[in-house]
Amino acid sequence: MKKILVFIVAVLAVVGIQRAEAQSQSSYFMGGTYFRTDLNPAFAPKRGYVALPVLGGVDVDVSNNFLSVNNFVFERDGGLVTAFHSSVSSEEFLKKMPNRGRLAMNMKSNILGVGFYVGNLYFNLGLNANVSTDASMSMDIFKAVKQLGNGIYDLGNTAFNANAYMDAYVGTSIRILRNLRVGARAKLLVGIANFGGDFNKLQVNVDPNVVNGVMSGQWRANGIFIDNSMVRAGSELPLNEVMRTDLGYIFSNFKNYGLAFDLGAEMCFLDNHLRVSAAVTDLGFIRWGKKSHIGGIIDGEFNYSGMNIETSEIEANYDYELLVTDGSETQGYTSMLNCSLNIGAEYNILNDRIGFGLLSHTTFYNTMSYSELTASVNFRPLHWLSATVSHTFLNRNRAGIFGFALNLYTSGINFYAGMDYIDLCWVKGPTLGSMKPSLPRYAKSLNAYVGVGFSFGGAKDMYSDSGVKSKKAKKSKRGTEAE
């Protein structure tokens, strides 16, 4: 039983950090890429671009505050043992764990995008597909796993939320003063699916041979493939009647709409050596319609006795009900997007060839908020090349976890790629048959973003004086005209 639990935790520690994301901190100070407009709409690339499906960009991210290999390994006699070794006390193990576990995942895929300049104005428009999930949970489960003794553990007050939606956007960026650039982006949202719930009771009874539990709570679901006309109050969820697969119904059910805005600004000081910026992104909501809304209560029991190593089958039984409210009585509801706040500052030297940046990034989820602080060194050695090396602090991110991003922006191609959490410290994981894989030790998060756009037009410098005259220059011109 203990070996099985060790295996499960090792898998969770790795799976929990693999993700794709929509807010990539390392690229924030990279001047050439069109991708960073997602982080601050005041930013503008040097050229216009066209981004095509799949190639345009994919960004995936998972964040958590408890799943890392380091939280489950301990140094003993010059080597490493797992948290389930007899030499590791429960107190020592639980000291590494937060009071509540927080887990989130975001994924964005650019379906189509276009950006172009009209004089001093930069415009961009396009279409994105988005998926976001977040959950907040009790850490009592790790007490049960470590102690492996008789006891009842309270996992209540657990909540989760998931959204899938499309957004069609149009944005602009303009330099309104010699040292100030502002930007805004408006998004029309179309909801694809929403699922959420919370457990007000989730109790687990653990002994060395079996895990039993009871659960109760509330849940809701909404989506273009849901039809609640056959739902009756107090009945079990009739999945075969609620879930529609005919394309005619699905296309006619695109009735979950919303609106969101990105707002940003950047100011330059000390003759453009210091740049300070701030932005709010995904400030908006989706209104989910009544016709495609179902919800109700969760009530059930379960037991788990482990995994059969020979057959790879999980030995578990469960008995639960998803009771629903009457479809005619359900109401539409509104869900908020995961809004983000970015505040950055960069000081550059050597004619903007090297910059030192600091970025505060906070995401507000439905069940929690998540903040990080990223320091970076940004290199711009050529007019068509930039690179960044970064380190993210807060949320117990350890030294030795770095980010890296690269951007090539020639007259025909705009290519970018990067990762925010690259763990340089690896350890040997538990033996699995004849294999003993290496695992990243400290990382709780890992993201990757990559994309290719096709550039067009002449290069623009968003920090040059082109198109914006200083007050002094304007006064000088008026004086000349008066003479």
What are these regions (language model features)?
Residues 1-25, 345, 483:
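Bacterial Sec-dependent N-terminal signal peptides
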Residues 23-483:
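Subset of outer-membrane beta-barrel
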